[in-house]
Amino acid sequence: MRLTTPLGLVTRAILAAAISGLVLAGSLAIVAVIAVAGGMILSAYGSDLLGFVQITPPRMFWPIVWSLCALGATSLFVRAIVRIIRTERAAFLERTTPLSEVAMAETSYIDSSAERLARQVGIATPTVRIDSTTTPLAYTTYRPDAPIVSADRDETPIIVLSTGLIKTLSQSELSAVLAHEIGHIANDDLRLITVLLVPLIAAETLTEDEGSTSNVFELCGHLLSFIALIGVGVFSRGRELAADRAAAVMSGEPAALASALEKLDESTTPKPTTDLRDHARSMNAINVLPTLGPVATGTGLLSTHPSLETRLEQLRSLTRD
């Protein structure tokens, strides 16, 4: 059950897909160029060796070899991207505990709220896990072994709530945050944002060290990463507002989500922890609040979330309605 399909969101999705498609094509092209260049160097030595033994290969022999080099390199590159995504999903989930195994007073309320909200929008109840960190976090992801990009909606996502978030919020605020995450699931945001993050990770894979521009390929990788972040931001800013609206509708309490956002904003450190920064490219766009610090909020090109003021104004307007 999709909760929002306004034209503006469709336009954002098309624009983001175009940007991300360009980035992915560029990344694959760079890998292919490197592979072909290596193949040409190899063919130079190979030609000398074949000439020494007096063997003349067919005219198309070396172009075929170069093509196979490009095909093999791009195939390995894609496999590397898949491995990176699965590793990052696993890294986030390995520090979490199933809700049923956590001894907290709020466990029963969280479980019943997740079931009730999922039933409201006609989706399977998502798995809820608890992260013991005191940093307020609420995000949605897939299992590490789930398909990277799936054409169906059979995969049940996992919602992760941190102990810090649970202790910070009241029950109504916690329910509103759960509704926000379930709104993302109902709107298929997780699957769509994963599609957009693949080109970003592909571009980042071309750069060995953050900030390094030691050769033209790394320079291109940084440029493509910047462009990919623009595409992710264009899409995710609109989806965050849509998830806020969905949460307000499901909970019937826009003020509860507004209060939760204000509390979380006040309790969030301006400098995210290293592990959050390391994995932000796979998780940041589906976190109720950004994990990249101030640069991730607002109207800037790289912002993944709207400003707090924009989100609160939308919720206030829903309250008035």
Regions found by a protein language model. Give the residues of each.
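Short helix/loop segments within enzyme catalytic domains
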Residues: 105-123, 213-284
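Residues at alpha-helix boundaries and short interhelical turns
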Residues: 169, 186-189, 234-237, 251, ...
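Active-site-proximal gating segments in proteases and membrane effectors
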Residues: 122-125, 129-151, 249-321
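Peri-catalytic and regulatory segments of divalent metal-dependent proteins
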Residues: 80-194
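DG-centered beta-turn motif at the end of beta-strands
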Residues: 180-181, 243, 307
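Post-HEXXH active-site segment of zinc metalloproteases
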Residues: 189-221, 264-265
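Loop-to-transmembrane-helix entry motif
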Residues: 17, 21, 181, 185-189, ...
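Hydrophobic or amphipathic, alpha-helical segments that drive membrane association/targeting
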Residues: 1-131, 204-207, 221, 225, ...
